[in-house]
Amino acid sequence: VNSKANNWRFLCCGIAILAFVSGCGNADNSSAGFVRFDDGTPVRSGSVEFRSVADGSRYASRIGTDGSFTLTDQDGEPRCPPGEYEIVVVQIVLTEDLAADAHQHGGTVPRRYADYYTSGLTTTRGVADTTPLLVTLATGDE
């Protein structure tokens, strides 16, 4: 009888661990992507935000120095559900105390991309879409 109880506990622990491990991470990468200028260079600093056209929910991320990002919801969970989105890219660069050759923020994002009304950036994610999100900004566009 005692060995049956131990087997049952072992099975329950195994199921719990399997459920925990399989729920971790974002295996489909549906919230990952890149922000680049139209000449192919990455946006090296700032943040990106996607706003759902359907319900206004927002998914945001900081932009890595290689232009990469992973969108998260307001609870910090990496995700970007299927749907249509408006996009903004915001970059605040504080450089008044630096010489021009010491700036490491890369190309400057034009101000119009920081506002949903002027950015003109949109995307649609399908249900099974796991391709990386790509946000492209026009260079020299003010």
Predicted regions and their residues:
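Sec-dependent bacterial lipoprotein signal peptides
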Residues: 1-22
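Beta-strand-dominated extracellular/periplasmic modules and repeats
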Residues: 24-142
